[in-house]
Amino acid sequence: MNIDNIIVPLDVPNEAAAIALIEELPEIIWWKVGLELFVSCGPQIFSILKQRQKRIFLDLKFHDIPNTVAGVCRSAASYGVDLLTIHATAGRVALSRAQQAVLEGAKIIGQKPPRLIAITILTSLTSRDLAFDLKIPLELPEYVLQMALLAQESGLSGAVCSPQEVEQLRRVCGDDFLLVCPGVRPSWAEVGDQKRSLTPAQAIKAGANYLVIGRPITATADPREALRRICQEISGDQKEGS
């Protein structure tokens, strides 16, 4: 595990703020573009990142009928992004169509297709939310597993899950299935609205490929120092466990 496995969200309101954050953390390779920034400045953000040789995690969490998600995934892939998300609850047909569309979109520009990964369930939700609000009669870990298996069976590259589900998904889905984990909080940071969090070191030990770490880095007075502390915490834990 190294800094290339950390994804920092560009959870900022506009292009100027995005550029400022990117330049403040030059060592970060992976940046996540979510709904707020994409709605604010559109595909221009992709050019900004590519000019700086960054990799792009486009996290718009597509969720619609099969024809619509296929169209939007084809368009997204044609921009040359590296990772792309779709909700597993869009269903098997939509997932399969989206995966095929990603290949088609990448072919248009002659580039390697992005890896399409499924949102299993939002990391802000709890077992109680699943049972009482969403009326889903499964324990949360089982539900996440079923969504991940649906994604894998539909040809997707991986899934987004909380760190607490990583160990089970890695065991069942295998080493080639990409696991991306938001809801990661270092030992010294507040959990906030993430209900199923672990520390970066714990998530890595469980089998995560990429860690999405936002506010513990970006909401601090010194983001570079926060990033250094996170890397130090991970490195120290790995040395202790070796």
Curated annotation (Swiss-Prot):
Substrate binds at residues 11, 32, 59-68, 123, 185, 194, 214-215. It catalyses: orotidine 5'-phosphate + H(+) = UMP + CO2. Catalyzes the decarboxylation of orotidine 5'-monophosphate (OMP) to uridine 5'-monophosphate (UMP). GO terms for cellular component: cytosol. The lineage of its organism: Bacteria, Bacillati, Cyanobacteriota, Cyanophyceae, Oscillatoriophycideae. This is Orotidine 5'-phosphate decarboxylase. Belongs to the OMP decarboxylase family. Type 1 subfamily. Pathway: Pyrimidine metabolism; UMP biosynthesis via de novo pathway; UMP from orotate: step 2/2. PROSITE patterns: OMPDECASE. GO terms for biological process: 'de novo' pyrimidine nucleobase biosynthetic process; 'de novo' UMP biosynthetic process. It is an enzyme of class 4 (lyase). One of its GO terms (molecular function) is orotidine-5'-phosphate decarboxylase activity. InterPro entries: Aldolase_TIM (IPR013785), OMPdecase (IPR014732), OMPdecase_AS (IPR018089), OMPdecase_bac (IPR047596), OMPdeCOase_dom (IPR001754), RibuloseP-bd_barrel (IPR011060). Its EC number is 4.1.1.23. The active site is at residue 61. Keywords: Decarboxylase, Lyase, Pyrimidine biosynthesis. PANTHER family: OROTIDINE 5'-PHOSPHATE DECARBOXYLASE.
